[in-house]
Amino acid sequence: MIVPRYYEDLSVLHENTMPARAYYIPASKRMDNLVEHREESDRMQLLNGTWKFQYFNSIYDVQDPFFEKDYDTENFDEIQVPSVWQMAGYDTHQYTNIRYPFPFDPPYVPQDIPCGAYAHTFVYHKDENAPKAFLNFEGVDSCFYVWINGSYVGYSQVSHMTSEFDITDLLQDGENSIAVLVMKWCDGSYLEDQDKFRMSGIFRDVYILKRPEQAISDYHIKTKIEDMLAKIELDVKFYSPANVKISIEDKNGAVVAVGSIAEEGTAVLEIANPELWNTENLYLYQLILETENEVIVDHIALRKIEIKDQVIYLNGQKIKFRGVNRHDSDPVTGFTISVEQITTDLTLMKQHNFNAIRSSHYPNAPFFYEMCDKYGFMVIDEADIEAHGPFMLYREEDTDYNRFKRWNEKIADDPAWEAAIVDRVKLMVERDKNRFCIVMWSMGNESAYGCNFEKALAWTKKFDPDRITQYESARYRNYDETYDYSNLDVYSRMYPALSEIQEYLDKDGSKPFLLVEYCHSMGNGPGDFEDYFQMIQDNDKMCGGFVWEWCDHAIAHGTAENGKKIYAYGGDHGEEIHDGNFCMDGLVYPDRTVHTGLLEYKNVYRPARVVSYDKESGELVLHNYMDFDDLKDYVKISYKLTQDGLVISKGKLSEVSVAPHSEGKISLNINVPENGKCYLKLIYQLKKEMPLLEKDHILGFDEIEVSQKDAKCQLAEKWLEKTSADSELQVNENDTQIHIKGREFAYTIDRRTALFTEMKFAGREYLNHPMELNIWRAPTDNDMYIKSEWRKAHYDKAYTRAYTTEVVQGKHGVKITSHASVVAETVQKILDLTITWTIDAAGKIDADIEATKDGEFPDLPRFGVRMFLDKKLADVRYFGMGPQESYRDKHQAASHGLYRANIGDLHEDYIRPQENGSHYDCEYVELNNSRYGIVASAEKAFSFNASYYTQEELEKKTHNYELTESDSVVFCVDYELNGIGSNSCGPVVLDQYRFNDVLFRFQFTLVPYVKG
């Protein structure tokens, strides 16, 4: 074999790598802008670019010494470094969540392990002031061997961590060659079973650092803040001792502290009356470390994170993590993420009120943390560890209890893995120890618990006692043994029900409760942000949470003929082991287009909320949910008063001082009309420009109904009014049909269904297909589990049948009453119905449907009528919650208004099609064109959905670009829909959002019309 089999040897994790150290970029002179422009340093030589590359299906196919200096690579392909080779057309894509993509046989991997051979030439000029050269790889998946000028340099693994080699003696002045052999898998892959597409290659930057002989090798910044004095301790290590001048400058460039050190040890500097860093005030000091031939510029954020009485404090202030889990993921570049891509993510996060990020489930590129310091995010830094696969091993006793009980046997509690697990934690902590945005170290994710994590936690706490530790998998254990949790500072949980959280707070509560993952944001959802928000705010021991997750993971495959982007997920590349679209679970689409779920999050976590408003006295009580800023310093507030969706007055509130986590009062007097649906909307805007945020950026809003006694939408009332038309209707009946004809209309009702089959008005047919009673919806991703119950109940096959029908004709119209039911093959009646249609002389249709559900059946997906309307009715006008989709448990980002849209604009284009685009709490909706239309209106608010796609089409197709439009506008007028929730990987829909009514009554009005 061309290389030693270190990739299957737990005793060899690295060979010839330098000791782990803090990340920094040196230069020959002071350079202050290295966070996002580090390549400008004259002591950093990037080796990124076009490299030669050859992919091998098996390590045994690598026969030639491609790493030799003069090896002819003419037959090699070319590849960009950094990149992943799957995105360059090699190998195949595979998405898997828990299951390993290879046999569980540690430390061994498949014998014919795929690999990639890289070769590159570069020019290197030696610098007499910086003669030492250190080769850095910031990310290589999974392990690699490296050569310089044909000489073997070393070996390393841990995909998402930096590996550094001293190559001083191997370089020559002028042209040099570098060769790298990257293995697709190694023994470390058993610890890299993260929920993501599996990708391979040199995916982060490769560079050489030029260093003086006498230079700093490592430094550790420690801060103590007491009584308006900041003490900065700088532990310094050297390659060879050097005189170091130390200075600290404030943001204006004024020197506030100086010191020096000349040998390994600790320098202590002090800053009086320091400015403290937090996520709302991003104050950074500049640290300058200067030796004779080198300057290192870093920054310091002075802050103190601590736990007192089970409550987390930052700088003495109680805080809440408004967090999100973020993977490195891009549909085109895969794991390879640039500064610009990170800036896009951080900007969107700031715009949507996040203040914290969990680096799930591995450390990010080092500049990511510098950017979080700069832009104001608290970070949970997570070790590159996930060993979820042992949970899925074959067990004779195949129960969840037994799986959880034995999960830790093979890795977490097997001492053979101690060195590998502790190594990964040490590498993370050592590299990122000087990044003050990091307030919490995480030992990894979903790997069970055991002796190896006890050791990792003990080392971490000893090395860095000032940060918090967390590891959610500590709750998984061998139930026959007792493990040491003393070095864990928080109790972390994923996707607990609210009742489970309350139980912990009531019975134990010995540590702060952290929602390390919650509100699984897959497809249409989540539907429970507001409920978790209330739980988090109601108890100080609840320190907040991190939503799962930031972005949909997908692979871009160009554009379909219909112009839609083609995004692929698990199973789309022919792989046998995959987890489908479970990777499509983000708050943004793969290209960072915003999901409606992100809008929902933003407004739930707005900086302020109305506690109460007395419209008589004008007293408005506000709560400030900021952790540090007084409301007057952060937010300016404007208001709009609307009547039936139209703005009738607006203005700005005077400045109001409200301390963080406190309430304050202000006066707002408005004149509310005597009639109509009236809402007062308060808009919170950013008062000042901030990094990544523009002044006047909208941070959220509150909406308060302020209607008087006649609180009815006048638009709806207009269509509900009795008409003055007074003409005799013609009613003709036969065994199957009832024909009703008036001066301008001709309707037909099918006696067998009690529903309309024809609806002609002014000579124009409105219905392309018969009306239906509808209890089904295209399952959302969050219907993942309940949909099996729904199908078992045959809800997806249900239809309406009528038994008896009575026709009563009067002077001003006709009333048709049917006893009917909703039925499906093999099961009993689902619903008993009394359906009454009252049609007046002008053609207005009043519906009254009384329903009784058989209590044996599960919650209904929905209940309403579905019409297939003339496709020319393409314009929509409605009074309800918009402009984006809204549901009974997902409408915090929507507000009441009079909205206009095109049918196509109402569709939310989820990559896996599903129920979408409904609008909640509506009283009136109108579909029309320039000549004619139809209105649905009701006294009691309803939901509606107008789409070019049937629910059958949404359910049948697996990708949005495959969707085919119907020949109709599919118009659903719904009494109710079941809640959205987050049950794709979370608790069931909360009781208050379930559609579990046994008795209900749906009354609404339909009015076809012609304009003019």
Annotate each PLM feature.
Residues 1-39, 88, 96, 151, ...:
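Extended substrate-binding grooves/exosites of carbohydrate-active enzymes
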Residues 172-175, 235-308, 678-719, 724:
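Extended acidic/polar, glycine-enriched regions
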